[in-house]
Amino acid sequence: MIFQKKKNEKIEDLKIEKKNLIIGIGRLTKQKNFLLLIRAFKKILIKYPNYHLILLGEGEQKKMLEEEAKKLAIQNKIFFLGYQNNVYKYLLNADCFVLTSLWEDPGFVILEAALCNTLIISSDCPNGPNEILSSGKNGFLFKNNDVTDFLKEFDKFKNSTNDELKKKRFLAKKQVKMFTQFAHHKSLESIIELN
């Protein structure tokens, strides 16, 4: 789990420009609701055609999600990369991390994204995300299982200034440091070496 913060550690195996990346991480299951993300991503591409979506994880819905991407004719914009030992190089190169879960335990992956200074857009699902994120302050929360509200929050993200996004990232990282439930990890900051 130890990594050095290297923004320059590129995702060389992908034949895409290393910007305009959205990342989703988790088991490809109903709970994680990646179907919502894929359907929303189709609409994102209408406004922001240079984006790509990276999904990290395995699960019983993988084939169905790949078929949905083909049905929507966006399969060339989505990379299903399976389980990855090192998610950090993806988080460090992403514009934003999106969590679309229908329900969630306090999300460890949200903490990882915040410590990588990756902007977070998350469903306001039961447990977890709203214990860490305050919408508009240190990230963006959208109504659970609501594509329209997700797209609204994504537009807020895109319309934010660099200074506003920098402040949100800083406050998210600060909140993670105060998040006592994960104190038994001896502070993620000491495990995940960041500048």
Residue ranges, per PLM feature:
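A conserved mid-protein helix/loop that constitutes part of the nucleotide-sugar donor-binding site
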Residues: 20-46, 53-56, 60-66, 108
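Nucleotide-activated donor-binding/catalytic signature segment of Leloir-type glycosyltransferases, i.e.
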Residues: 66-82
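Short hydrophobic beta-strand element within catalytic cores of glycosyltransferases
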Residues: 119-123
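Conserved acidic donor-binding segment of nucleotide-sugar-dependent glycosyltransferases
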Residues: 134-136, 140-147, 155-162
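A short, well-ordered alpha-helix in the C-terminal region of glycosyltransferases
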Residues: 163-178
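C-terminal alpha-helical cap of glycosyltransferases
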Residues: 181-195
